[in-house]
Amino acid sequence: MIVQMYGVSWCPDCRAARKFLDSYGIEYTEIDVEGDPAASAEVVRRVGKRAVPQLVIDGEWFQPYKPGRGLLVDELHERLGIPRA
């Protein structure tokens, strides 16, 4: 499985997504959209706005956080194939 996370260092939602991935030992490549204009443009092209965090799991884009709902833990478990405890 190839996982990429588009985010920024100061974003609390990005920190929550990083913590989730790290807690399950999921390897991922982090792409800083603030320091990489091409990456920022790619996020806008794919999702219509500069919204982070964004995960790309085996080529499929997914926003793991929704305002008012927080980190989408159940969906992350499902998409990453992590069994629920």
Predicted regions, residues:
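Nucleotide phosphate-binding site architecture
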Residues: 12, 34, 63
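Thiol-based oxidoreductase modules, predominantly thioredoxin-like and allied folds used
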Residues: 26-40, 49
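Non-catalytic, surface beta->alpha helical segment in thiol-disulfide oxidoreductase systems
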Residues: 57-85
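Rhodanese-like catalytic fold shared by cysteine-dependent sulfurtransferases
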Residues: 45-46, 82
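Positions that flank functional sites
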Residues: 36, 43, 59
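Structural micro-motif
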Residues: 47-57
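Local sequence-structure signature of Cys/Sec-based thiol-disulfide redox active-site neighborhoods
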Residues: 1-27
